[in-house]
């Protein structure tokens, strides 16, 4: 089992292109099933949206390839990364 705080300190990397996407800022949980639906990244600080807030990137749980000691590997198509 892993705690949310342990989950949040891991870097998220796209295995499709090797790019570091950032770290987890939040998670989306289905309250009916109690399962994680998606992880939400706060962005890498390069893209600022409205009022200077970082853009969020929502990654569905099914796109997670592997959760390792220091990194979470995800598979995303190029437009997302």
From Swiss-Prot:
The keyword Plastid does not apply. One of its GO terms (biological process) is sporulation resulting in formation of a cellular spore. Disruption phenotype: Inactivation of the gene does not affect sporulation, but a ylmC/ymxH double mutant shows a 100-fold reduction in the efficiency of sporulation. Induction: Expression is regulated by the sporulation transcription factor sigma E. SUPFAM superfamilies: PRC-barrel domain (SSF50346). Keywords: Sporulation. It comes from the Bacteria. Belongs to the YlmC/YmxH family. PANTHER family: SPORULATION PROTEIN YLMC-RELATED. This is Probable sporulation protein YlmC. It comes from Bacillus subtilis (strain 168).
């Amino acid at each position: 089992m892993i705690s949310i705080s342990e989950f949040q300190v891991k870097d998220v990397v796209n295995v499709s292109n090797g790019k570091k996407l950032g770290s987890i800022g939040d998670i989306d949980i289905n309250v009916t099933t109690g399962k994680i639906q998606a992880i939400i990244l706060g962005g890498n600080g390069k893209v600022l949206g409205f009022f200077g807030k970082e853009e969020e990137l929502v990654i569905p749980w099914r796109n997670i390839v592997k959760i390792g000691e220091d990194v979470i590997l995800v598979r995303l198509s190029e437009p997302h990364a």
